[in-house]
Amino acid sequence: MEEFQEYFKKDKSPQQHFLYPLLLQEYIYTLAYDDGLNGSIFYEPIEFMGYDNKSSLVLVKRLIIRMYQQNFFIYLVNDSNQNRFRGHTNYFYSHFFYSQMVSEGFSVIVEIPFSLRLVSSPEEKEIPKSQNLRSIHSIFPFLEDKLSHLNNVSXILIPHPIHLEILVQILQCXIQDVPSLHLLRFFLHKSHNMNSFLKNNKTIHVFSKETKRLFWFLYNSYVYECEFLLVFLRKQSCYLRSTSSGAFLERSYFYGKMEHIHIIIVYCNNFHKTLWSIKDPFMQYVRYQGKAILASRGAYLMMNKWRYYLLNFWQYYLNFWSQPYRMHINPLLNYSFYFMGYLSSVLINPSAVKNQMLENSFIIDTGIHKFDTIIPVIPLIGSLSKAKFCTVSGHPISKPVWADLSDFDIIDRFGKICRNLSHYYSGSSKKQSLYRIKYILRLSCARTLARKHKSTARALLQRLGSGLLEEFFMEEEQVLSFIFPKTTLFPLHGSHRERIWSLDIIRVNDLVNQII
């Protein structure tokens, strides 16, 4: 970052500095393939077919020499629209490698103007760095504390898909370098054309990871603009109070700091996910991926105003026609909504309180609002069906594509899926429904092993004994007893009713991701 600051301090004239010459600097690619400026754990290692996972200095120098050629980017543009796979396999992998290196290096460069804001910000030291904010489960205690006191809730779908040119226009305010913006357009259209090409060529899947880092950055920029109206209107509604605001970026992760706004960041490896929570006595806003929840204690009319503001803002500011059905307003007590893989609702638990005054006693009936989260069994079975673990009705079937693996690998893959689902749904208030999911995975694993050994699942289980696949039935309290063997004062009876929110979940299982 100090090298970036020196680059921008060399010339004090008002002339606009260009970002694209940084593509010819070797340290840009070192940063791009060193898991980011701060060594973030959220970037997956990038794999290239035919090359090592890390970019060597020789390859970087070779790339820079090719970029000095005047026709390099023109060559990339022409090649992106042609099929160069027939008889040119080695050439294709080499060309794809260089193209992806440029994309990753360019991703670092476009983040520089935003990163410099963070470095120069006087509030840099006040940015929260709590590790448990990275957990996806960290939002549920917040919902338990806030939603039980609210009246109305609105489910929001962030407008999509977005036109590629709008993504470029969003960055024009901070990046006024025209050549860099043109290069950004090139990468966007190149990836768009390649995605349409891959629909007819499913065997070529290496492009699915190309420009991931760049699109994470663009996605955050786009969502930041979509949610800008919420911040703006909240400031206007509190104009009588003293507020201080600051918006800055640490790499591609947005932070915001306001007196009445608290922003929580959540990430995931397969796709960048940002989660915001607006703390306000009358309104709460939470978003995960492209779905958001807006809840308020106010009347239906107030919620309808927010709906009107958001729809018109998206329509006129982002040039995106957002249909009204993307926002539903419902009473919170009579409404269940899917959010982050859970079916959430607010229930009323009736209770009777006996009150005695002198010689008179009477019973007061009251209701306590409680935020409840349960496992959506039917959608989860649908996800298992799409992954070929069972039929649509939930009947376990074998996994033919895994039948060629070793027995250990088959059991290990099924075991990881089962443990991840059990760990993620540890916050459910009714865990009995999770047993059905475990049963499906256990029988699917047994039938996959039986398919490999040309036997039946029943004969396989009888021959190997009941201890087979016992890891599928490891409960959450057993895991806790391993972690805290001496601090547990009593066994966790009725664990199917206990909700356990974990602070180490940074990735959502793909099966859960389909029902979010």
Curated annotation (Swiss-Prot):
- A Pfam family this chain is assigned to: Intron_maturas2
Q: Name one GO biological process term.
A: mRNA processing
One GO cellular component this record assigns the protein to is: chloroplast
Name where it mostly resides.
plastid
Entry's Gene Ontology molecular function annotations: RNA binding
| Keyword annotations | Chloroplast, mRNA processing, Plastid, RNA-binding, tRNA processing
The yes or no answer to whether the keyword Plastid is present is yes
UniProt keyword RNA-binding, yes or no: yes
State the similarity comment: Belongs to the intron maturase 2 family. MatK subfamily.
So what does this one do?
A: Usually encoded in the trnK tRNA gene intron. Probably assists in splicing its own and other chloroplast group II introns.
Which protein, by its recorded name, is this?
Answer: Maturase K
